């Protein structure tokens, strides 16, 4: 079968930094497909390869990577792409076309309209399979997401639509389900009888000024909270699915999201130097902190504290699950530290379980000790990157790592109050935790796990 990935946004950051390396690695694993990259930055394939692909890339990859100058605003663009695809398809009797939209959401509508025109003009005397891949954020808000989905479903069936949140391709997300449901020692304590609180921390050291034109329209809510954070919460709190099939997992995730009320108590800020060279005042939030509850039977009353944003002192992504201290102090009234599970996503994937053990040469004095799993130490450095797993699933037609439209819709509903344009946005100095994040901890009598 002839399989072609038509890469919209083929000269953008996502394609250059994530998708092309993923394509190369999959080709090295003997997955067979062609890539047609579309872009406006270069006029020829030679210029594209010289400026976009590492010179050390093997010919086993570059021989299967083509390029077409493509301006979506050009009325002749569709004809050019149709002609190119006809040339690539040739006389093949089985063809799969994968349209990968690495574009801003505002361009989805035009892209889908053009894809429909291309499909109609192909005249392929063959068995044709179609897929379309759309990146997060899917839409700008609930209304636009629903509108884009209506447009998508006029051209593709739900089976053919792959909505990407690359965090679902990360090993830690899949490990989270395995850890919870394949280990009785964890499974039996993972509910509101024993868990006191959960923290989710996503701090980044870099800013957004180099891609301000894009980020100014997106902000921290659309960039991280509506997608990555909501998906993590579903994996942390979903009930055990009947199986690990995409349908059964999605059913339990949707139940979690439906139980969460819209976030009405939150704080947002922007770092002080944001847009300083842009010539205008930029009020786009780059940091947010809030509390929410999952109102299901097993997780009701467990507060989930979230903070996420840019220009922090240290880059870290982690989940901190704190357990209730129900231990009676029988050991000479020594203070007992709460048990915890700490899942670190960045800078490296580790899972720590914190327990209290006796210190040597003491009279029953205890000390918290961590038992650690380290992904790279245990399984080596061959763990696939998230996008490699995502693309592989697309190629084989497995939708287990892709959020459903119901999940996306519920996630937009939850964060919708945070998208209002009249928000108070506090300015915070770079490399410092915003005051409102510290205040959230103070008001709720907890300490951020730093």
Give the ranges of each region predicted by the language model.
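Secretory/organelle targeting and membrane-embedding segments
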Residues: 1-134, 138-450
């Amino acid at each position: 079968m002839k399989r072609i990935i038509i890469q919209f946004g083929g000269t953008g950051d996502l394609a250059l930094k994530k998708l092309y390396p993923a394509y190369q690695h999959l080709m090295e694993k003997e997955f067979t497909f062609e890539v047609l990259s579309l872009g406006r930055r270069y006029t020829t394939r030679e210029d594209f390869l010289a400026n976009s692909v590492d010179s050390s890339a093997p010919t086993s990859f570059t021989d299967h990577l083509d390029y077409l100058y493509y301006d979506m605003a050009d009325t002749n663009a569709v004809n050019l792409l149709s002609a190119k695809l006809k040339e690539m398809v040739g006389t093949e009797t089985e063809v799969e076309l994968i349209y990968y939209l690495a574009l801003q959401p505002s361009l989805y509508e035009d892209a889908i309209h053009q894809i429909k025109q291309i499909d109609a003009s192909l005249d392929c005397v063959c068995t044709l399979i179609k897929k379309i891949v759309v990146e997060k954020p899917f839409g700008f808000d609930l209304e636009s997401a629903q509108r884009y989905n209506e447009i998508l479903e006029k051209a593709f069936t739900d089976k053919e639509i792959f909505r990407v949140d690359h965090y679902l391709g990360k090993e830690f997300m899949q490990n989270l389900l395995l850890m919870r449901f394949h280990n009785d020692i964890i499974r039996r304590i993972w509910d509101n009888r024993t868990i006191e609180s959960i923290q989710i921390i996503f701090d980044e050291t870099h800013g957004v000024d180099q891609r301000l034109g894009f980020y100014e329209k997106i902000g921290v809510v659309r960039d991280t909270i509506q997608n990555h954070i909501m998906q993590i919460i579903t994996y942390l709190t979903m009930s055990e699915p009947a199986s690990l099939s995409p349908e059964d997992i999605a059913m339990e995730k949707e139940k979690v999201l439906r139980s969460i009320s819209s976030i009405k108590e939150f704080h947002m800020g922007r770092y002080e130097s944001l847009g300083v060279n842009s010539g205008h005042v930029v009020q786009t939030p780059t940091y947010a902190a809030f509390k929410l509850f999952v109102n299901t039977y097993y997780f009701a009353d467990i507060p989930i504290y979230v903070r996420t944003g840019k220009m922090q002192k240290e880059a870290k992504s982690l989940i901190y699950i704190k357990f209730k201290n129900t231990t009676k102090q029988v050991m000479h009234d020594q203070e007992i530290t709460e048990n915890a599970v700490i899942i670190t996503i960045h800078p490296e994937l580790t899972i720590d379980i914190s327990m209290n053990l006796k210190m040597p040469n003491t009279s029953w004095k205890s000390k918290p000790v961590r038992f650690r799993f380290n992904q790279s130490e245990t399984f080596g450095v061959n763990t696939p990157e998230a996008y490699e797993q995502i693309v592989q699933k697309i190629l084989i037609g497995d939708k287990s790592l892709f959020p459903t439209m119901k999940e996306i819709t519920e996630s937009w509903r939850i964060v919708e109050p945070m998208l209002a344009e009249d928000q108070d946005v506090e300015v915070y100095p770079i490399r410092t935790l915003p005051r409102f994040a510290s205040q959230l901890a103070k008001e709720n009598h907890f300490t951020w796990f730093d």
